[in-house]
Amino acid sequence: MAESQSQGADQAQDLNNELKTRREKLVALRETGIAFPNDFRRDSTSDRLHAEFDGKENEELEELGVEVTVAGRMMTRRIMGKASFVTLQDVGGRIQLYVSRDDLAEGIYNEQFKKWDLGDILGARGKLFKTKTGELSIHCTELRLLTKALRPLPDKFHGLADQETRYRQRYLDLIANDESRNTFRIRSKVMAAIRSFMVDHGFMEVETPMMQVIPGGASARPFITHHNALDIDMYLRIAPELYLKRLVVGGFERVFEINRNFRNEGVSPRHNPEFTMMELYMAYADYKDLIVLTENLFRTLTQDVLGSTTVEYGDQTFDFGKPFEKLTMREAICKYRPETNVADLDDLEKATAIAQSLGIKIEKSWGLGRIVTEIFEETAESSLIQPTFITEYPAEVSPLARRNDQNPEITDRFEFFIGGREIGNGFSELNDAEDQAERFAQQVNAKDAGDDEAMFYDEDYVTALEHGLPPTAGLGIGIDRMVMLFTNSHTIRDVILFPAMRPQK
């Protein structure tokens, strides 16, 4: 223990000494008037250079005489007397620089370059060549310091093994970890591919309020804020659903939105209070049309983003090339709890007994539909590994979904699961204003009974429905969970650039 404390003290002292030295170097740079120049322009990035020239031999490069200008962060440096090799990292990756004293302006190599530190941002100009080992490199004829880094690279002393540091100081994580940079590149590609798919299918992207007088569109506990000018409390939105459906009433028949939602709930590997959703609404369609659309969307995304219809996640392989499985909620319960008699799920007393045998704590306000849903979540949800649609959700847990014509106790709704996780939720929308008003009233009763996730009564939305909502289907997909899947990430914090964290003391 004492030895560990001593090592920690030594590391802290080393770091303090390095910080002091770097600041002294900055003072000298300021005296020259070139501390932070802004007149250097690059014409190439490392990924483009590798893509175009990795396949060429050194003789070809010499014949071509390709001169390039690059800029980036100095990650490594090997000084060998009058010459050095530098690894430069930019947005596209890394490329090697060959720096020779005799090829630079007088004094640059010894008086400047050797005094620069790892982490400094450099600009370089020179001709491409390949080393004896075949590595594409730049033979520098010009080298400039563009930004002085006052702190060392994160791995020099204690690295970024601490996950909390990776999340709190994401910029360090991105500098040090190729995997993290790739994760967020894939996230960007996913967002772009979704937008392209939606536009190709005739949808219009819109934006709806992030602050709402009445939070709606989902069952969740909202964040509360205060609007000073209006002197009213407002809520960060838990979902955009009710505003998007107002737009369908107004005549925009296919709309979608990609944006953040906020839910004042717990943090877990699958939950962050601020998260990204894509919601879409399509007039003159039902939930079956959405199932087809969802299947096509995921098949297209995997192909466009990953170049394959199969996704590796941990020790599992998900196949998006095959037709997705479709089960009703009751079928799923019976499949993964074979001893269940399906008829018992239609009997309140027997369903209650099943739930209690599973250790489910039943609230007094729960009806049969909520109990069956809890049984499903306990027995089947984690077993839905391959892409699966679960249908026939009870009306009790689906306050915004249209009732099924043959059985009004269930709704025309589905949830989409991959790897035991819910990824999407869609349904035929309830467009009966009187039925919606009644369900809002039931939600208010549940809230009065202590359910702080129950919905508020949104009178303006009911008024919108009274003007006529066409037959409509709506879908919500969790972007963060989708990116987790595509990047083999096992916690949501790994796919959110700046996840919610408790402030450091």
Swiss-Prot record:
Cofactor: Mg(2+)
PROSITE patterns per record: AA_TRNA_LIGASE_II (PS50862)
EC number(s) from the headed UniProt entry: 6.1.1.6
Taxonomic lineage from the root: Bacteria, Pseudomonadati, Pseudomonadota, Gammaproteobacteria, Enterobacterales
Localization of this protein: Cytoplasm
Top class in the EC scheme: ligase
Protein family according to the UniProt entry: Belongs to the class-II aminoacyl-tRNA synthetase family.
Main location: cytoplasm
Gene (name only): lysS
Protein name: Lysine--tRNA ligase
Keyword tRNA processing in record: no
Species the sequence originates in: Pectobacterium carotovorum subsp. carotovorum (strain PC1)
Single GO cellular component term: cytosol
Transmembrane helix in keyword set: no
InterPro entries, per the entry: Aa-tRNA-synt_II, aa-tRNA-synth_II, aa-tRNA-synth_II/BPL/LPL, Lys-tRNA-ligase_II, Lys-tRNA-ligase_II_bac/euk, Lys-tRNA-ligase_II_N, Lys-tRNA-synth_II_C, NA-bd_OB-fold
Catalytic activity: tRNA(Lys) + L-lysine + ATP = L-lysyl-tRNA(Lys) + AMP + diphosphate
